[in-house]
């Protein structure tokens, strides 16, 4: 009974016949195992696989990008996930498929055979090579290796038109030790493959093209492939949360001159705007690289607005000083000041004319033939004249104060239109070049890529 149960529960492979307790290999596995032993028994992965020493290996090189991970403006780095496509002929990996059960393709780990030492020259994190994956080897010796890699490459960031900027970042690939007489690189496809590209939320790739070049020294020449990525920043985020608030603060400065001069909040409003602009400038400093070669567009606009606000504080202080002038604190108003600010400028600024309310004293010219006696009526007239002179003097003082206040209003209105005009011209002068560049460079490239 025990023998019957033992025979019933015997493993299937054991019934068919085993080799050391393991199932025997199938015919295909035997052929592939034999093929690997024959190919790699005397294979040396450090030796360049050529028939003659003077022969050179031609590497077909292509690039596919799967993701533009990040563009670090501060450290001037571009992080990408790419696939390196390489294909070459290994004369030591050839076989006749008929001798090995019709096997035409095998997969071999890249660390088991000779591979070209093609690296990214402008790498910024010290990782010059990609991941180690399997290669596809065909019976005629063709080796295809698609190598995934995550690169941080150096990229010179031009922030002149930030955040409406267009960057050109390049990736330069070449052999680390072999010259062109030993390993030559052939550009397989000029365009970077973007079939499996995952869109980035901040950057858009306008074009990605490759080109071949050669570097020559005293003895040898070294081929390399350079891929240029033209990328455009998507400016919606920075426009909504950076540019529009800055423009709003700039025009808010103009509103200061619409407040009455006797309001103390004018200086407070100007100071608050200046502090807000300083905060925006600190935010910009954290984003853009520290460089003295170029000043970003938004930085120029912030500096322009800060100077604008500083001048507005100065002229506001001057207007408040004019508003509180009187005959007891300052000398009499100069005739040219009266003519310009009380008669000329109000008409040009569409303000209500300031009537001349100065009292014109009538000349009292009474001539007498001889001294008259002072009677009661004359004494009363003297009292009336005294009161009249006192009233006229107070009226003159009050009218002088009103004239200075009106001049302060004229200055506020003049500065209102002047600063509004300067703000509009400055804003258009800084952003029109960006609009021109956008219309003449970025839009045609985008349309061309869409048609393609």
Curated annotation (Swiss-Prot):
Its main location: membrane. Disulfide bonds join 155-169, 219-220. It catalyses: Ca(2+)(in) = Ca(2+)(out); K(+)(in) = K(+)(out); Na(+)(in) = Na(+)(out). GO terms for molecular function: acetylcholine binding; acetylcholine receptor activity; acetylcholine-gated monoatomic cation-selective channel activity; protein-containing complex binding. Glycans are attached at residues 140, 168, 214. InterPro entries: Neur_chan_lig-bd (IPR006202), Neur_chan_lig-bd_sf (IPR036734), Neur_channel (IPR006201), Neuro-gated_channel_TM_sf (IPR036719), Neuro_actylchol_rec (IPR038050), Neurotrans-gated_channel_TM (IPR006029), Neurotransmitter_ion_chnl_CS (IPR018000), Nicotinic_acetylcholine_rcpt (IPR002394). It holds the Pfam family Neur_chan_memb. It is found in: Synaptic cell membrane; Cell membrane. GO terms for cellular component: acetylcholine-gated channel complex; cholinergic synapse; dendrite; dopaminergic synapse; neuron projection; neuronal cell body; plasma membrane; postsynaptic membrane. Activated by a myriad of ligands such as acetylcholine, cytisine, nicotine, choline and epibatidine. It comes from the Eukaryota. GO terms for biological process: acetylcholine receptor signaling pathway; behavioral response to nicotine; cellular response to nicotine; detection of mechanical stimulus involved in sensory perception of pain; hippocampus development; membrane depolarization; monoatomic ion transmembrane transport; neuromuscular synaptic transmission. Keywords: Cell membrane, Disulfide bond, Glycoprotein, Ion channel, Ion transport, Ligand-gated ion channel, Membrane, Receptor, Signal, Synapse, Transmembrane, Transmembrane helix, Transport. The chain crosses the membrane at residues 240-260, 269-289, 302-322, 415-435. Residues 28-239, 436-452 are extracellular. Residues 1-27 form the signal peptide. Component of neuronal acetylcholine receptors (nAChRs) that function as pentameric, ligand-gated cation channels with high calcium permeability among other activities. nAChRs are excitatory neurotrasnmitter receptors formed by a collection of nAChR subunits known to mediate synaptic transmission in the nervous system and the neuromuscular junction. Each nAchR subunit confers differential attributes to channel properties, including activation, deactivation and desensitization kinetics, pH sensitivity, cation permeability, and binding to allosteric modulators. Neuronal AChR that forms heteropentamers composed of two different type of subunits: alpha and non-alpha (beta). CHRNA5/alpha-5 subunit is only able to form functional nAChRs when co-assembled with another alpha subunit, can be combined to CHRNA4/alpha-4 or CHRNA3/alpha-3 and CHRNB4/beta-4 or CHRNB2/beta-2 to give rise to functional receptors. Interacts with LYPD6. This is Neuronal acetylcholine receptor subunit alpha-5. It comes from Rattus norvegicus (Rat). The gene is Chrna5.
């Amino acid at each position: 009974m025990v023998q019957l149960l033992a025979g019933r529960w015997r493993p299937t492979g054991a019934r068919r016949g085993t080799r050391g307790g393991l199932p025997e290999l199938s015919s295909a596995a035997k052929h592939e195992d034999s093929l690997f032993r024959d190919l790699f028994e005397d294979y040396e992965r450090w030796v360049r696989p050529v028939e003659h020493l003077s022969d050179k290996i031609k590497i077909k090189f292509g690039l596919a990008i799967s993701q533009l991970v990040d563009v670090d403006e501060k450290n001037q780095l571009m992080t990408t996930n790419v696939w390196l496509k390489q294909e070459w002929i290994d004369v030591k990996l050839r076989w006749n498929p008929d001798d090995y059960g019709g096997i035409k393709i095998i997969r071999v780990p890249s660390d088991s055979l000779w591979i070209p030492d093609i690296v990214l020259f402008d790498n910024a994190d010290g990782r010059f090579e990609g991941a180690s994956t399997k290669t596809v080897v065909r019976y005629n010796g063709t080796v295809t290796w698609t190598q995934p890699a995550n690169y941080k490459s150096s990229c010179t960031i031009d922030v002149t038109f930030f955040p409406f900027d267009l960057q050109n970042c390049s990736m330069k690939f070449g052999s680390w030790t072999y010259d062109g007489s030993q390993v030559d690189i052939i550009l397989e496809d000029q365009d970077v493959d973007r079939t499996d590209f995952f869109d980035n939320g901040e950057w858009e790739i306008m074009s990605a093209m490759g080109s071949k070049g050669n570097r020559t020294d005293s003895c040898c020449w070294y081929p390399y492939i350079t891929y240029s990525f033209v990328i455009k920043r998507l400016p919606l985020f920075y426009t909504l949360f950076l540019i529009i608030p800055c423009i709003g603060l700039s025009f808010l400065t103009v509103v200061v001159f619409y407040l009455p001069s006797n309001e103390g909040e004018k200086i407070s409003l100007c100071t608050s705007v200046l502090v807000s602009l300083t905060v925006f400038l600190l935010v910009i400093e954290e984003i853009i690289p520290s460089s003295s070669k170029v000043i970003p567009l938004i930085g120029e606009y912030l500096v322009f607005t800060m100077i604008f606000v500083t001048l507005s504080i100065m002229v506001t202080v001057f207007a408040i000083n004019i508003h509180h002038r009187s005959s007891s604190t300052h000398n009499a108003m100069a005739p040219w000041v009266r003519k310009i600010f009380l008669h000329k400028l109000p008409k040009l600024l569409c303000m209500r004319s300031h009537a001349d309310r100065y009292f014109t004293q009538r000349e009292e010219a009474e001539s007498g033939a001889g001294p008259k006696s002072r009677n009661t009526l004359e004494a009363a007239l003297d009292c009336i004249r005294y009161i009249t002179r006192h009233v006229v003097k107070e009226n003159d003082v009050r009218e002088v104060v009103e004239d200075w206040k009106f001049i302060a209003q004229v200055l506020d209105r003049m500065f209102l239109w002047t600063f509004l005009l300067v703000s509009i011209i400055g804003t258009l002068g800084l952003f029109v070049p960006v609009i021109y560049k956008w219309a003449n460079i970025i839009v045609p490239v985008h349309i061309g890529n869409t048609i393609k």
